Every structure is written in structure tokens, then in C-alpha cells.
Amino acid sequence: MDLTDRRNPFNNLVFPPPPPPPSTTFTSPIFPRTSSSGTNFPILAIAVIGILATAFLLVSYYIFVIKCCLNWHQIDIFRRRRRSSDQNPLMIYSPHEVNRGLDESAIRAIPVFKFKKRDVVAGEEDQSKNSQECSVCLNEFQEDEKLRIIPNCCHVFHIDCIDIWLQGNANCPLCRTSVSCEASFTLDLISAPSSPRENSPHSRNRNLEPGLVLGGDDDFVVIELGASNGNNRESVRNIDFLTEQERVTSNEVSTGNSPKSVSPLPIKFGNRGMYKKERKFHKVTSMGDECIDTRGKDGHFGEIQPIRRSISMDSSVDRQLYLAVQEEISRRNRQIPVAGDGEDSSSSGGGNSRVMKRCFFSFGSSRTSKSSSILPVYLEP
């Protein structure tokens, strides 16, 4: 041994290396340590799933909101339309479904008269001008022209003009008064009693008064129209006319076997005889003539004025009824008494008066014809 070894005996001793320092990470014995790539995968999957779920919820919410808004808008529009329809129900219907005019039978029931010009009184120039022209076509009335008068307001129009107007409107085109065929004139120029002639007080007193209607039996009516007095002048100041009021009474007419052609019917006026011949129909709905005779102061009849009247020709049944009534009239005419003397009837007015005897028959209500028909009869002095 060397002296050095002897001096330091610990130099030959070999010391082991120090152990490494302990790591800071703690590993659980239950869950073993995994790699970093395996840890990042669940985080990305959760993030993607969350984003997709959020987008789906947003899209669903927007779709729901849009549908609700559209439904609310449609409901609002429907409510507005319903309110407007409740306030004005005519707006939702077409004109074909809502008929605001009068029926053909109601239009034909409006009285017709013959226009007569008169002298204009001072201070009534404007009223006379308005009463001598039609407010629908703005044409002046001609002498002896047939016109139609509205019973409610006494305004006068051409027959064709007012008929077309009343098909779409139920009021007067001049004053907008509602038209009703049941209305009567203010002064009651025409009043037909329903009682028989023998029970009527006018038949007992044969002195006829102007503006009265003498009713015999239910087959005919005699109308006496005289000159208007001072009280009547205010109502009829616009026109001087002969008023015809259609008054239909329901009587059964025996049809029987009628000929196919209309035979001429004699019309008696005193000692003279006239014959009514067949006339060609200018219109499909026109058939039948009537006459009005003028009675002078001496009680004799003067000029004969024919008047055209219309009946319904909608079906062949009306034609057969017409022929049957013509035959019935010719049979009954021999038994109808004369309705008064000329001398007695001319004593009331002091002036010219007009007498007309007409026969009113009602064909009754049928499915093919809605309006009643008026047929002519003989005129007797």
C-alpha cells in the first residue's frame, strides 16, 4: 500500500450515483396515464355536437316564428274581411246574386197614363218644364204618349226608360224615393170599392163625382175621371193626365176548348159597331187593346182612343187562357148591364169627363207566369 492509501483509506470506496429527483405529475393507480392525442378527441367531439345542437335549435326557432307570423297575418286579413263583410254584406256578393231591383210583375203594376199638355200658369214655368221631359233620357214627352208614373212621388218617365231603371234599382231616378206598387196617390184620385154595385152608395146615387170609381160586380170597374178642382191642382200641377190603376180580382175562368185563332170581337158604342182585329205583336210580351171614349156635355160619346196593354206571354198556358177569356167575355157581354146613364154621369163635373169600363181577370198564381194578365172587354155607352 502506498502512503497515500494509508493516509486516506476512503479513497478506494465507490459511492453509487444519486437517485433522480421525483416527478411532479401524480398518476392514479386506478386510471393509468394516457397519451395527449387521446385526451384531445373527446373535447373536439363535444364542441362540434354543441355547435350543431345550437344551430338546429336556432333554425327550428326561426321556422316556428316565421310560420306563426304568417298564420297571424292570414288570421288578421281574414278578420278584417269578416268585419268588412259584416258591415257591408253587399260587397262580398256579386250583382247577379243580389237583385236590388223590382220584379217584372211589380214594374208592370205601376200605373200608366196618357200625356196631355196643358197651359203653363205664371210662376210654374220651371215645374212645367220638368214635368214635360223624362229625367232618364232627357227627351220631351210627346202629345198622347204613354208614360209611367211613380205612385210615391208622382214623377213621370217613359215606359222603356223607367222599366230598365227599375230592373236594377228600387227607387225613383229623380228623387230617390223607394218605389212601391202598393202606394196610392196623395189625393186618392182613384178609389175602387170592393163591395158590389148594388150595395155601393155611389150606385144608389147615380150622380157621379170626378175622381171616383164605381164598382159593379167583381167582373168590371167603371172609372170616372173629371177635371181637377182647386184642391187636386196642387198634387197634379205637373201633368194633366188620365190615370189607370190596375186592380186585379181573383176570379176563376173556365178554360174549356178554345179555338186556335182569335176571332174578331165586336165593340159596341151606341148604334155603331166596331170590330177589334188581330194585330201583329211588336213585342213578345204585348197583346190586347183597350179603348177609352170621350163623353161630352150632352152625354154622347166622342173620339175613341186606343190604348195598348201588356200581358205575360211566357208560356203557352197564357195563350190558351187568353183565348178562353176572350170566348168567356163574348158570352158574358150579352148579360152585363149598362153602368149608368150618360146624362146622370155628366152632371157632376160640368166639363168633359172620361168614362172607361174595363174587365179585370186574374189568372191566379202559376209556376210559369208570375204576373197577372189584364184583358179588354166591350165598351158600352
Swiss-Prot record:
What membrane topology was assigned to this protein in its record? Single-pass membrane protein
Q: What is its EC number?
A: 2.3.2.27
State one molecular function term (GO).
Answer: transferase activity
Keywords of the record = Membrane, Metal-binding, Transferase, Transmembrane, Transmembrane helix, Ubl conjugation pathway, Zinc, Zinc-finger
The catalytic activity, as recorded, is: S-ubiquitinyl-[E2 ubiquitin-conjugating enzyme]-L-cysteine + [acceptor protein]-L-lysine = [E2 ubiquitin-conjugating enzyme]-L-cysteine + N(6)-ubiquitinyl-[acceptor protein]-L-lysine
Compartment(s): Membrane
Biased composition, class Polar residues, residue ranges: 250-261
The protein's matches in InterPro entries, at most eight in alphabetical order, are given as: ATL1/ATL16-like (IPR044600), Znf_RING (IPR001841), Znf_RING/FYVE/PHD (IPR013083)
| TM region(s), chain numbering | 46-66
Q: What is its main location?
A: membrane
Stretch list, region Disordered:
1-31, 249-269, 334-354
Q: In which pathway does it act?
A: Protein modification; protein ubiquitination
Q: Does the keyword Metal-binding apply?
A: yes
Supply the CDD domains for this chain.
RING-H2_EL5-like
Q: Which GO terms describe its biological process?
A: protein ubiquitination
Domain of life, source organism: Eukaryota
Zinc finger (RING-type) stretch: 134-176
Query: Can you quote a single GO CC term?
Result: membrane
Which family does the similarity line name? Belongs to the RING-type zinc finger family. ATL subfamily.
What note about domains is in the entry? The RING-type zinc finger domain mediates binding to an E2 ubiquitin-conjugating enzyme.
Q: What is this protein called?
A: RING-H2 finger protein ATL1
